[in-house]
Amino acid sequence: MSSSEISPYLSFRDSARQAMEFYQSVFGGDLGISTFEEYQVSEDPSEQDKVMHSRLVTDNGMVLMAADVPNRIDLIPGTNFSVSLSGEDEEQLHGYWDKLIVGGSADMPLEQAPWGDSFGMLTDRFGVSWMVNIAGPGGGEGPTSGAAPS
């Protein structure tokens, strides 16, 4: 039986790597980091070293994820977090998406992503930002579902 995971996802302006390395020094565990360049998500040369996704998994199972926000997107302090839903159960995760979006809005449609998974972002009717990642055929190595490549 596959399971889904819910985790906090933090957003930063050019400091995700430093923040996640700090959190790793506090909580321990394994930290995976992927850059914009690795996933080819930006053509802006100044963004290639930015963190597209990072995932810290502590020895006791806590999970914290983070990324740098692209330059074209505003980052408002105090709203720099989302909730990530990820896993392999496509029907279950689509069901969560369908319920969460009622009265809310899709910020990015739930569709095929560059890393092979299905990915989407929405804001629910209470203003909470959600990211949904459904593992593709490769087994969930996408940004919000598995350990990012280092």
Where are these regions (language model features)?
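Core segments of cupin and vicinal oxygen chelate
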Residues: 10-61
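Short glycine/proline-enriched turns and hinge-like loops at secondary-structure junctions
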Residues: 46-47, 76-78
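Vicinal oxygen chelate
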Residues: 2-6, 32-34, 52-57, 62-68, ...
